[in-house]
Amino acid sequence: MIIVEHLEHYLGEIESGIKCLDRRYHLSVSVFPSQPYKGVTTFSTLGLNRYDLNYKSRFELIFTCSEEWNKENIAAFLSGVAEYLIDNRQPILRGEIIQLPRVIIEGSKMDALYVSAPFYFDDDFQVCYGEHYNIVFPLL
């Protein structure tokens, strides 16, 4: 799978995957510990790119946070954002602010997300060039 190869090239080997079984779409979330540095974990959706969001490219979401945050909660949050995008066929573009219906995780005050390029990582990470369409990796 070209997406997995792309992710592992820039983020290292996938430590684990979390399937979001309570969701309507076939999505999972990949976990990359100590990326981009020690004490931080990076998460990526897998499967969002199968859905047309009414844009020239397809998407997989990237989220980076403290390794202390609960992985299952982050996976549920990311799959929820992905479901919203799929349901509304809405692309997620750089510079947008996404207002959330609640905080990301219990104990956090974060209830909105800013969409940016994945600036923590190598510039070439932000796009995976495919045969039929490109996949972009916005950082939330």
Task: State where each predicted segment sits.
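Acidic, proline/glycine-rich low-complexity IDRs
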Residues: 1-140
